[in-house]
């Protein structure tokens, strides 16, 4: 069974996604520049609520997109976003399979994988790279997002985000510890405050393997190139893998 890492916090995720897309849209658009869209759809693995789907659609006008999101509540928001936008509704096919079981088109123009690779085992990644590599044209990119953490370590609690909706304030806190090797266990807590008092909290945890772009290139048997380096919290590390 494939774990669903996002159900517990899905109701809050759009606040994270709105901030994330502000720092990732530019690098992703750069990474997709020059893609030959005649070779097939763009496959987005881990589409979340659809913010990145919108970026792909703007960067590559007219190309069909297969947006895969296994988390049911996240996929509900993705489907709502696609359905409410006629420009997306005609182009985006939403599917529920996780990366490990995704049924891929025979050929694809490009692949976008944000917030996913560290959740996969090495065996799962190697299998995925092989399936993608045989479907991509020469020069067709796999655009990947990494955590931007150079090595596994303990991360003390810190606040990642604070937003207000109506009379309530929402805070996103996170911490982490090393589990084994380069695997870190991240613990997140959402606090809902009203009048300065916490009225509700939601917590979840997940494991993430720290990986370098060079490691992914070696696993995939593909060339790797950095598009955008992570730095501050919320700023992603984005790279390209190409045949």
Feature-to-residue mapping (PLM):
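Conserved class I S-adenosyl-L-methionine
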Residues: 1-48
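Class I SAM-dependent methyltransferase SAM/SAH-binding core
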Residues: 50-101
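A short acidic, Gly/Pro-enriched loop at the edge of an enzyme's catalytic core
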Residues: 103-111
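A short glycine-rich, Lys/Arg-flanked "PGG" loop and its adjoining helix->strand segment in the class I
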Residues: 126-138
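Conserved beta-strand signature within the Rossmann-like core of class I S-adenosyl-L-methionine
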Residues: 139-146
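SAM-dependent methyltransferase
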Residues: 149-211
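C-terminal lobe and adjacent flexible extensions of AdoMet/dcAdoMet transferase-like proteins
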Residues: 207-243
